């Protein structure tokens, strides 16, 4: 089992796809890494030699911020925006869309499930 940046890559997938299971590595970055290390993208993860895994691990850990480091960096950037009181920081703090999207309708992903508002009670009939 290939373990890179603290993530176990799925054994039966191609290396090109398997690398995308690491937070911070998408398909294009995966292709860059494979080109830099000279590993064939069509190779299955289970067929990688120890040397290939070591080369991939070295490339990822030396040249890219991934997993915990990247998550920490993103959290620090958001915290900085909140601390200095920017508009974007306020939107993050309030849990609303940050990039100018409308909120009168939509924005459900960012705002969460719709909360039920109690309606007017009907008067008891006579």
UniProtKB/Swiss-Prot annotation:
<keyword id="KW-0694">RNA-binding</keyword>
<keyword id="KW-0689">Ribosomal protein</keyword>
<dbReference type="InterPro" id="IPR019980">
    <property type="entry name" value="Ribosomal_uS13_bac-type"/>
</dbReference>
<comment type="subunit">
    <text>Part of the 30S ribosomal subunit. Forms a loose heterodimer with protein S19. Forms two bridges to the 50S subunit in the 70S ribosome.</text>
</comment>
<feature type="region of interest" description="Disordered">
    <location>
        <begin position="92"/>
        <end position="126"/>
    </location>
</feature>
<dbReference type="GO" id="GO:0005829">
    <property type="term" value="C:cytosol"/>
</dbReference>
<dbReference type="GO" id="GO:0000049">
    <property type="term" value="F:tRNA binding"/>
</dbReference>
<dbReference type="InterPro" id="IPR027437">
    <property type="entry name" value="Rbsml_uS13_C"/>
</dbReference>
<comment type="similarity">
    <text>Belongs to the universal ribosomal protein uS13 family.</text>
</comment>
<dbReference type="GO" id="GO:0019843">
    <property type="term" value="F:rRNA binding"/>
</dbReference>
<dbReference type="GO" id="GO:0006412">
    <property type="term" value="P:translation"/>
</dbReference>
<keyword id="KW-0820">tRNA-binding</keyword>
<feature type="compositionally biased region" description="Basic residues">
    <location>
        <begin position="101"/>
        <end position="126"/>
    </location>
</feature>
<dbReference type="Pfam" id="PF00416">
    <property type="entry name" value="Ribosomal_S13"/>
</dbReference>
<dbReference type="InterPro" id="IPR018269">
    <property type="entry name" value="Ribosomal_uS13_CS"/>
</dbReference>
<comment type="function">
    <text>Located at the top of the head of the 30S subunit, it contacts several helices of the 16S rRNA. In the 70S ribosome it contacts the 23S rRNA (bridge B1a) and protein L5 of the 50S subunit (bridge B1b), connecting the 2 subunits; these bridges are implicated in subunit movement. Contacts the tRNAs in the A and P-sites.</text>
</comment>
<keyword id="KW-0687">Ribonucleoprotein</keyword>
<dbReference type="GO" id="GO:0003735">
    <property type="term" value="F:structural constituent of ribosome"/>
</dbReference>
<dbReference type="GO" id="GO:0015935">
    <property type="term" value="C:small ribosomal subunit"/>
</dbReference>
<protein>
    <recommendedName>
        <fullName>Small ribosomal subunit protein uS13</fullName>
    </recommendedName>
</protein>
<keyword id="KW-0699">rRNA-binding</keyword>
<dbReference type="InterPro" id="IPR010979">
    <property type="entry name" value="Ribosomal_uS13-like_H2TH"/>
</dbReference>
<dbReference type="InterPro" id="IPR001892">
    <property type="entry name" value="Ribosomal_uS13"/>
</dbReference>
